[in-house]
Protein backbone atom coordinates (compact mmCIF):
# COMPACT_ATOMS: atom_id res chain seq x y z
CA UNK A 1 0.00 0.00 0.00
CA UNK A 2 2.73 2.46 0.98
CA UNK A 3 4.79 1.86 -2.15
CA UNK A 4 1.94 2.68 -4.54
CA UNK A 5 0.92 5.69 -2.45
CA UNK A 6 4.47 7.06 -2.51
CA UNK A 7 4.58 6.60 -6.28
CA UNK A 8 1.27 8.43 -6.70
CA UNK A 9 2.51 11.29 -4.52
CA UNK A 10 5.77 11.59 -6.47
CA UNK A 11 3.82 11.66 -9.74
CA UNK A 12 1.74 14.59 -8.46
CA UNK A 13 4.75 16.51 -7.12
CA UNK A 14 6.60 15.95 -10.39
CA UNK A 15 3.93 18.09 -12.09
CA UNK A 16 4.21 20.93 -9.57
CA UNK A 17 6.33 23.95 -10.46
CA UNK A 18 7.73 24.21 -6.93
CA UNK A 19 9.14 20.67 -6.76
CA UNK A 20 12.03 19.95 -9.09
CA UNK A 21 14.02 17.09 -7.56
CA UNK A 22 13.89 13.86 -5.59
CA UNK A 23 14.92 15.89 -2.56
CA UNK A 24 11.82 18.08 -2.95
CA UNK A 25 9.56 15.04 -3.33
CA UNK A 26 10.95 13.48 -0.15
CA UNK A 27 10.87 16.70 1.86
CA UNK A 28 7.33 17.67 0.89
CA UNK A 29 5.84 14.23 1.44
CA UNK A 30 7.72 13.98 4.76
CA UNK A 31 6.13 16.95 6.49
CA UNK A 32 2.68 15.74 5.52
CA UNK A 33 3.45 12.20 6.70
CA UNK A 34 4.76 13.64 9.95
CA UNK A 35 1.54 15.55 10.64
CA UNK A 36 -0.62 12.58 9.68
CA UNK A 37 1.39 10.29 11.96
CA UNK A 38 1.30 12.83 14.81
CA UNK A 39 -2.48 13.08 14.48
CA UNK A 40 -2.82 9.28 14.65
CA UNK A 41 -0.50 9.14 17.66
CA UNK A 42 -2.48 11.80 19.51
CA UNK A 43 -5.70 9.99 18.71
CA UNK A 44 -4.33 6.75 20.18
CA UNK A 45 -3.13 8.53 23.32
CA UNK A 46 -6.48 10.25 23.75
CA UNK A 47 -8.30 6.92 23.45
CA UNK A 48 -5.96 5.28 25.97
CA UNK A 49 -6.52 8.13 28.40
CA UNK A 50 -10.30 7.88 27.97
CA UNK A 51 -10.23 4.14 28.76
CA UNK A 52 -8.33 4.91 31.95
CA UNK A 53 -10.70 7.74 32.85
CA UNK A 54 -7.97 10.34 32.52
CA UNK A 55 -7.93 13.63 30.58
CA UNK A 56 -5.60 14.08 27.61
CA UNK A 57 -4.14 17.40 26.54
CA UNK A 58 -3.63 17.55 22.79
CA UNK A 59 -0.39 19.08 21.55
CA UNK A 60 -1.99 20.56 18.44
CA UNK A 61 -4.83 23.07 18.77
CA UNK A 62 -8.16 22.06 17.15
CA UNK A 63 -7.90 24.37 14.12
CA UNK A 64 -4.53 22.89 13.14
CA UNK A 65 -5.24 19.20 13.60
CA UNK A 66 -5.20 16.92 10.57
CA UNK A 67 -8.94 16.30 10.57
CA UNK A 68 -9.65 20.04 10.69
CA UNK A 69 -7.57 21.47 7.84
CA UNK A 70 -6.31 18.47 5.84
CA UNK A 71 -8.99 15.82 5.88
CA UNK A 72 -12.30 16.81 7.51
CA UNK A 73 -14.67 13.85 7.55
CA UNK A 74 -18.41 13.34 7.15
CA UNK A 75 -20.45 11.35 9.67
CA UNK A 76 -19.77 8.23 7.58
CA UNK A 77 -16.00 8.72 7.79
CA UNK A 78 -15.40 9.81 4.19
CA UNK A 79 -13.68 13.04 3.15
CA UNK A 80 -16.01 16.02 3.45
CA UNK A 81 -15.37 17.75 0.12
CA UNK A 82 -17.57 20.68 1.14
CA UNK A 83 -15.41 21.43 4.18
CA UNK A 84 -12.00 20.48 2.78
CA UNK A 85 -9.90 23.41 1.57
CA UNK A 86 -8.27 23.26 -1.86
CA UNK A 87 -6.61 25.53 -4.40
CA UNK A 88 -5.31 28.91 -3.21
CA UNK A 89 -7.27 28.67 0.05
CA UNK A 90 -5.40 25.51 1.05
CA UNK A 91 -1.98 26.74 -0.06
CA UNK A 92 -2.42 30.10 1.69
CA UNK A 93 -3.60 28.46 4.92
CA UNK A 94 -0.57 26.16 4.97
CA UNK A 95 1.91 28.95 4.21
CA UNK A 96 0.44 31.79 6.26
CA UNK A 97 -1.13 30.00 9.22
CA UNK A 98 -0.15 26.32 9.63
CA UNK A 99 3.63 26.60 9.23
CA UNK A 100 4.00 29.72 11.43
CA UNK A 101 1.86 28.06 14.12
CA UNK A 102 3.96 24.87 14.08
CA UNK A 103 7.26 26.75 13.93
CA UNK A 104 6.15 28.74 16.97
CA UNK A 105 6.32 25.62 19.14
CA UNK A 106 10.09 26.13 19.31
CA UNK A 107 9.60 29.32 21.32
CA UNK A 108 6.59 28.07 23.30
CA UNK A 109 8.08 24.71 24.37
CA UNK A 110 9.21 24.21 27.95
CA UNK A 111 12.54 22.71 26.86
CA UNK A 112 14.56 21.24 23.95
CA UNK A 113 13.76 17.63 24.87
CA UNK A 114 10.01 18.05 24.45
CA UNK A 115 8.06 16.94 21.40
CA UNK A 116 6.73 20.50 21.13
CA UNK A 117 10.25 21.85 20.68
CA UNK A 118 11.04 19.20 18.06
CA UNK A 119 7.89 20.08 16.11
CA UNK A 120 8.90 23.73 16.15
CA UNK A 121 12.44 22.90 15.07
CA UNK A 122 11.24 20.81 12.12
CA UNK A 123 8.85 23.45 10.82
CA UNK A 124 11.34 26.26 11.33
CA UNK A 125 13.72 24.57 8.89
CA UNK A 126 11.39 23.66 6.02
CA UNK A 127 8.72 25.36 3.94
CA UNK A 128 5.87 24.26 1.75
CA UNK A 129 7.18 24.17 -1.83
CA UNK A 130 3.99 22.89 -3.45
CA UNK A 131 2.81 25.91 -5.42
CA UNK A 132 -0.51 24.50 -6.58
CA UNK A 133 -3.12 24.10 -3.87
CA UNK A 134 -4.86 21.58 -6.10
CA UNK A 135 -1.75 19.41 -6.24
CA UNK A 136 -1.41 19.77 -2.48
CA UNK A 137 -5.01 18.62 -2.03
CA UNK A 138 -4.34 15.53 -4.16
CA UNK A 139 -1.20 14.68 -2.17
CA UNK A 140 -3.04 15.12 1.14
CA UNK A 141 -5.78 12.73 0.06
CA UNK A 142 -3.18 10.04 -0.72
CA UNK A 143 -1.43 10.59 2.62
CA UNK A 144 -4.76 10.43 4.45
CA UNK A 145 -5.30 6.89 3.12
CA UNK A 146 -2.26 5.61 5.04
CA UNK A 147 -2.52 3.86 8.39
CA UNK A 148 0.31 3.40 10.90
CA UNK A 149 -1.30 1.18 13.54
CA UNK A 150 0.40 -2.17 12.88
CA UNK A 151 4.11 -2.75 13.44
CA UNK A 152 4.40 -4.19 9.92
CA UNK A 153 3.04 -0.94 8.47
CA UNK A 154 5.60 1.10 10.38
CA UNK A 155 8.40 -1.16 9.14
CA UNK A 156 7.18 -0.89 5.54
CA UNK A 157 7.15 2.89 5.85
CA UNK A 158 10.71 2.84 7.19
CA UNK A 159 11.91 0.65 4.29
CA UNK A 160 10.29 2.88 1.67
CA UNK A 161 11.60 6.05 3.27
CA UNK A 162 15.11 4.61 3.14
CA UNK A 163 14.58 3.84 -0.54
CA UNK A 164 13.67 7.48 -1.13
CA UNK A 165 16.85 8.59 0.66
CA UNK A 166 18.84 6.19 -1.52
CA UNK A 167 17.23 7.66 -4.63
CA UNK A 168 18.30 11.12 -3.49
CA UNK A 169 21.88 9.88 -3.45
CA UNK A 170 21.53 8.26 -6.86
CA UNK A 171 20.24 11.58 -8.19
CA UNK A 172 23.43 13.28 -7.03
CA UNK A 173 21.99 14.98 -3.96
CA UNK A 174 23.77 14.84 -0.62
CA UNK A 175 20.85 13.26 1.24
CA UNK A 176 21.89 9.83 -0.01
CA UNK A 177 25.15 10.06 1.90
CA UNK A 178 23.30 9.14 5.08
CA UNK A 179 21.64 6.00 3.75
CA UNK A 180 22.79 2.71 5.31
CA UNK A 181 21.73 -0.44 3.38
CA UNK A 182 19.53 -2.84 5.35
CA UNK A 183 21.83 -5.89 4.89
CA UNK A 184 24.63 -3.92 6.54
CA UNK A 185 22.32 -2.83 9.36
CA UNK A 186 21.26 -6.45 9.98
CA UNK A 187 24.89 -7.55 10.16
CA UNK A 188 25.72 -4.82 12.66
CA UNK A 189 22.74 -5.75 14.84
CA UNK A 190 23.74 -9.43 14.82
CA UNK A 191 27.29 -8.56 15.81
CA UNK A 192 26.20 -6.25 18.64
CA UNK A 193 23.68 -8.86 19.94
CA UNK A 194 21.27 -6.53 21.76
CA UNK A 195 19.26 -7.98 24.63
CA UNK A 196 15.74 -7.22 25.82
CA UNK A 197 15.88 -4.69 28.62
CA UNK A 198 18.93 -2.91 27.27
CA UNK A 199 18.60 0.64 26.01
CA UNK A 200 19.14 0.81 22.24
CA UNK A 201 20.38 4.16 20.99
CA UNK A 202 20.65 5.38 17.41
CA UNK A 203 22.49 8.67 17.63
CA UNK A 204 21.92 9.52 13.97
CA UNK A 205 18.36 8.27 13.58
CA UNK A 206 16.82 9.14 10.24
CA UNK A 207 14.41 6.51 8.95
CA UNK A 208 14.92 4.42 12.13
CA UNK A 209 16.41 1.53 10.16
CA UNK A 210 18.73 0.49 12.99
CA UNK A 211 15.92 0.63 15.55
CA UNK A 212 13.55 -1.36 13.33
CA UNK A 213 16.13 -4.07 12.68
CA UNK A 214 17.01 -4.24 16.38
CA UNK A 215 13.31 -4.75 17.11
CA UNK A 216 13.10 -7.51 14.49
CA UNK A 217 16.19 -9.20 15.94
CA UNK A 218 14.83 -9.11 19.50
CA UNK A 219 11.29 -10.16 18.60
CA UNK A 220 12.60 -13.21 16.70
CA UNK A 221 14.46 -14.61 19.74
CA UNK A 222 13.07 -17.95 21.01
CA UNK A 223 11.34 -18.34 24.35
CA UNK A 224 10.13 -14.79 24.85
CA UNK A 225 8.03 -14.28 27.97
CA UNK A 226 4.97 -12.07 28.34
CA UNK A 227 7.15 -9.55 30.17
CA UNK A 228 9.65 -9.59 27.28
CA UNK A 229 6.90 -8.90 24.75
CA UNK A 230 5.58 -6.06 26.89
CA UNK A 231 9.07 -4.54 26.99
CA UNK A 232 9.31 -4.78 23.22
Describe the function of each predicted region.
Residues 1-196:
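Non-catalytic, mostly N-terminal accessory regions of nucleic-acid modification and defense proteins
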Residues 175-232:
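Conserved S-adenosyl-L-methionine
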Amino acid sequence: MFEQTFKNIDDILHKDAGCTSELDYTEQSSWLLFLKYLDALEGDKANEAALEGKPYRFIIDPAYRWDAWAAPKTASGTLDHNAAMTGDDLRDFVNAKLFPYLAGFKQRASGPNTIEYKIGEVFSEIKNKVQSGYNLRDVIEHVDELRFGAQAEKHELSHLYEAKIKNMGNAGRNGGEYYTPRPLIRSMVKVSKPRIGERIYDGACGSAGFLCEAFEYLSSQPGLSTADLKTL
